[in-house]
A protein has these predicted regions:
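N-terminal, charge-rich alpha-helical recognition modules
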Residues: 1-152, 156
Length: 159
C-alpha cells in the first residue's frame, strides 16, 4: 500500500504573495541636467527597484550610481520618494501625506508644477510612468496667493 505525505493546509496551497503597491510621489527637486536624476529617471529607478529589489541593479538600469541614489533619498523633500523606495523593496510603509508641505518639505508651487508620479507595474514588471496633476497642491497654491493678495490690499489701505 502506498503512503503519501499529508497535504498542506488549503491556505498554504492557495496563498499568494501580497501585492506590493507603490504610492505616487512628487519627484525630488534637483537641478536640470540631462545626465542627472530627472523625474522620469526617478520613476524608472523605483520601477526597476520593484523588479530587482537591488539598489545596485536598479541604479545601473537607469544609468546612475548606487551612491547617488542614496544621496537622492536623503535630500530635503524626498519623503515621498523614500516611501516609494521602501514600498518597492517590500518594506512596511507609513503613509506620507503628500498634500502637506510640512510632511513632504516641498512648497505648494513645486508640487503643483511637478505633479504626482505613479509607477506603473504589470505582472511584476515595470511598465512605465503616469504623471497625475496634484489638485490639492493647486488649491493650496491658490489659497496662498489669495492670502498674499489680501495682505497687500490691507497694507495699501493703511491697515
Amino acid at each position: 500500500m502506498k503512503r503519501y505525505p499529508p497535504r498542506p493546509p488549503r491556505s498554504a496551497r492557495t496563498a499568494r504573495r501580497p501585492r506590493r503597491r507603490i504610492p505616487a510621489f512628487h519627484p525630488v527637486p534637483v537641478g536640470k541636467r540631462h545626465d542627472g536624476w530627472t523625474p522620469a529617471r526617478q520613476v524608472a529607478f523605483i520601477g526597476m527597484l520593484y523588479e530587482t529589489r537591488s539598489v545596485v541593479a536598479a541604479a545601473k538600469a537607469v544609468g546612475m550610481g548606487r551612491e547617488s541614489a542614496y544621496r537622492l533619498r536623503k535630500r530635503a523633500g524626498a519623503a515621498g520618494f523614500a516611501a516609494a523606495w521602501d514600498a518597492a523593496m517590500g518594506f512596511a510603509v507609513a503613509p506620507v501625506r503628500l498634500h502637506q508641505a510640512k510632511c513632504t518639505g516641498l512648497p505648494a508651487h513645486y508640487r503643483m508644477r511637478a505633479g504626482l508620479m505613479q509607477v506603473l507595474v504589470h505582472k511584476g514588471c515595470f511598465a512605465g510612468l503616469l504623471t497625475k496633476p496634484d489638485n490639492s497642491a493647486l488649491l493650496q497654491h491658490i489659497a496662498q496667493l489669495d492670502r498674499h493678495l489680501a495682505a497687500e490690499r490691507m497694507e495699501a489701505w493703511g491697515g
